[in-house]
């Protein structure tokens, strides 16, 4: 179901501030006011920074090893990414938003577009921001406008000027909107990448205001239909619909780099089984079935001294499937066909693709029955959702190993915070 922001309607973009760092701070007050960074998979690069860390000049995406001196000198607190915690905190924020407005599009783990009711004023947005902070501990900024593009731009202004805006800015009622556009570069706009900005500069468009006033024909000639749509959005004409339900997925991938290089096929099989289990659970959650399965292996491209090998292989499944056990068996057969000894493998992954709706699929009398196995898997999914830890599910298959096995292939997460909200054994303890 989609909702178009028709004339007269307004949208809001709610964006959680420095989301991963904010989640860590909710349960550890000692982090408030000190620089905090969160790392990517395998503790490789910095993917979230508190305002204090940004002030130290720590760049987004910087490899951790390049920032060790700054971290040591300024006492920066460093955390491995805890996606279990972040996903749960995101769900709590989105639940509050759903109760506040007629329609919501969850755009990412830390962003959502809202369709606002007619009587929704800037003061209501401030109350909503306060409620989210009080109920979850997560600070957000809210930008309000007539279109998605302008709501994003309004949110940018709210965030960059928090002392003046208080984290909320309504572009649709601002008395001098052009003053915000006159010095803003085109790549400050949502959907305008660096190369798009370069194309615009070739036709004399360098600022957001110049883009807004540009000749639509020239924009379309330079950037095509996508550029024309952005231009219309910038002029308050809604072209991008609010998607209350995400479009059907074309595929689900699960892959991770290993904590240490892997050479034995037994370790690769265990890692692959875990990835297939995660991907198939996600496919089932969306009520879908996979008709194609593909796996790939990679050595470390950056270790030039190591022999390189990056094979992949796929196959169309005999029948659409979401059974973990059957998909693991198929994936292991494919792995056997591409595995070569003598290589130091860095990554393995699986893609479940060409997805079809479980409700629409009519199994042939001549295909192997899979519905019973999928139904059992769904029961396991529910048990793991209620009682397990997403990183270490309560119910697994023998081929997936245990939490204590696979120490080589499991990701590095040496600075991992507890799963405060999803694991009974890791609940925060309050002492008097």
Q: What positions do the PLM features span?
A:
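Short loop/turn motifs enriched for small/polar and acidic residues
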Residues: 145-147, 298, 351-355, 400
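Short, charged/polar, Gly/Pro-enriched secondary-structure boundary elements
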Residues: 121-123, 161, 304, 356-362
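Short aromatic/hydrophobic contact patches that present stacked aromatics
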Residues: 113, 316, 349
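C-terminal hydrophobic structural anchor segments
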Residues: 326, 332-395
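Solvent-exposed residues in well-ordered beta-strands and their adjoining turns
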Residues: 115-117, 298, 318, 353
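DNA-contacting surface of Y-family translesion DNA polymerases
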Residues: 4, 188, 196-345, 360-362, ...
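Residues at or immediately flanking beta-strands
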Residues: 139-141, 294, 347-349
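Gly/Gly-Pro- and Ser/Thr-rich, intrinsically disordered tail segments characteristic of DNA damage-repair
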Residues: 1-235, 239-242, 281, 370-432
